[in-house]
Amino acid sequence: MEIKTTAVAGTLESSDIQIMISKGSDGIKIDLESEVKKAYGDQIEKVITETLKKYGLDNVNIKATDKGALDCVIKARTLAAAQRATETQDKPDLEVL
């Protein structure tokens, strides 16, 4: 799967996460902003990484701004951003979730 454009999914509202995805060249790089990064940062990054790998993306840059999202929300927002970035949103791959 190839990133064709920079894409965003999610909001900056409470209990949500905003994911911005763009083309990368050296693996999955995540820039995470979160008030709970110290406690949950590793888990948030793990969920994002696993979702991207299941979707077939290995070289991407992620800017994630977390506002207390649950894992299911993180997965859904990551998948939505990935589908927009690869321009495949008309063919949802819900098995990734």
Swiss-Prot record:
It comes from the Bacteria. Disulfide bonds: none annotated. Keywords: Cytoplasm, Phosphoprotein. It is found in: Cytoplasm. Transmembrane segments: none annotated. One of its GO terms (cellular component) is cytoplasm. Signal peptide: none annotated. The modification O-(phosphoribosyl dephospho-coenzyme A)serine is found at residue 14. Pfam families: ACP. Oligomer with a subunit composition of (alpha,beta,gamma)6. Covalent carrier of the coenzyme of citrate lyase. NCBIfam families: citD (TIGR01608), PRK13253.1 (NF009726). Belongs to the CitD family. This is Citrate lyase acyl carrier protein. It comes from Lactobacillus acidophilus (strain ATCC 700396 / NCK56 / N2 / NCFM).
